[in-house]
Design a protein with these regions (language model features):
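Basic nucleic-acid-binding interfaces
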Residues: 1-142
């Protein structure tokens, strides 16, 4: 089953600099591949990550996200000692993706840097929630 997953750095701090991004995305890709399914596209900008994955059957989504975030936080702090206070924000967005929309979502993730020159994360995330008919309270969105 295909999923589009979005999560942010704690307090949306800009930890994921362009020079860090390829290494983090490679790490996340290997982690997903080894434990949870097939990574299709991983990308983002300095304060958040998008992943499109084809999840293995039987994998529990909350457990998967807890493991991905915990392991990648440890990896970031170990790999980049100057980021000793790196952490992911509590919570995430996870949206199912139909097969016909797979390529569109993959391209959307690929275009994140140019997309965020025009659109804030908050606006982007609210659009994703609305598009996927997820009820939310704006008070709890960063």
């Amino acid at each position: 089953m295909l999923f589009h997953i979005v999560f942010t750095t704690k307090d949306r701090r800009p930890f994921i600099k362009p020079e860090v991004q390829p290494r983090l995305y490679s790490y996340l890709s290997a982690l997903v591949h080894d434990r949870f399914g097939r990574p299709i596209r991983i990308g983002g900008v300095e304060d958040h990550v998008h992943m499109l994955i084809d999840k293995n059957p039987g994998v529990n989504e909350p457990d998967m996200l807890r493991d991905i975030k915990a392991n990648s936080s440890r990896w970031m702090r170990k790999t980049f000692p100057e980021m000793a206070d790196f952490a992911w924000q509590v919570g995430y967005g996870i949206f199912s993706v139909s097969a016909p929309h797979r390529q569109m979502v993959a391209e959307y993730i690929k275009r994140q840097p140019s997309h965020h020159r025009r659109v804030t994360f908050r606006d982007e995330f609210m659009r994703l929630l609305k598009r996927n008919n997820v009820e939310y309270d704006e008070r709890y969105l960063l």
